[in-house]
Every structure is written in structure tokens, then in C-alpha cells.
Amino acid sequence: MRKPQRGYARQDRVKEQIMRELAELVRTGLKDPRAGFITVNEVEVTRDYSHATVFYTILNQDAREITEEVLEHARGHLRSELAKRIKLFKIPELHFKYDESLERGLNLSALIDQVAAEKPVED
């Protein structure tokens, strides 16, 4: 019988630490001026800690493709720097994905506002 978990599970703690460290590394460690202002929104880690998907957004949408290239190019460097900062048996391989949830949320909000504006007010 498994013991009930208290508080955060280890995977959640590791995920939060990876997110904090990567946010700092992206902010201070990426020297490529072509990259936009990057915000790390979420990190998902596999159960065996072999892979981590990093969801990010950027301030300048015009630099999205260039930022993807910069992150892909810096992936190995970011992973090695991450290994220096956190003590894990296995440092996950990093996969970067642009987080489209903010854009989808804004589009959905605009659609709701549009429907609300078109609907006549009933007394």
C-alpha cells in the first residue's frame, strides 16, 4: 500500500525548480540579441526526468521564429547550466514549445465580448 503524499509531489518540486532556474538562465544567459523578451510560463517533466517541455511566450511576436531558433541552438548550453544549478541524477533533455494558451484565451475573450455586444438586452 502506498503512503499518502503530503504537500507537493517530488515531480512538482523538480518542475518548479527547473522552471525558476530556466527563467533565470534565459534572462541572463542568452546573449543573442535577435531573441525576443522570453518568459518561461510552464515546464512539464516526464516521470523519469528524462525530458522537460518548456512552454514560453515572447513579448515581440515578430521575433517568434528567430526566438525558436535561438532557443534550439542554446538548448545544450541551457541544459549544462541547469545541471550546475540543480542536483538531479538525470538532467532532462529540454524541448521548447511556444505557449499559445495566452493567444487562444485572448481570442476566446474577444469572441465572448463580440457575442455579448450582438445579443440584445432583455428586460
Curated annotation (Swiss-Prot):
The keyword Cytoplasm applies. Monomer. Binds 30S ribosomal subunits, but not 50S ribosomal subunits or 70S ribosomes. GO terms for molecular function: ribosomal small subunit binding. One of several proteins that assist in the late maturation steps of the functional core of the 30S ribosomal subunit. Associates with free 30S ribosomal subunits (but not with 30S subunits that are part of 70S ribosomes or polysomes). Required for efficient processing of 16S rRNA. May interact with the 5'-terminal helix region of 16S rRNA. This is Ribosome-binding factor A. Keywords: Cytoplasm, Ribosome biogenesis. It is found in: Cytoplasm. Belongs to the RbfA family. One of its GO terms (biological process) is maturation of SSU-rRNA. It holds the Pfam family RBFA. PANTHER family: RIBOSOME-BINDING FACTOR A, CHLOROPLASTIC-RELATED. The keyword Cytoplasm applies.
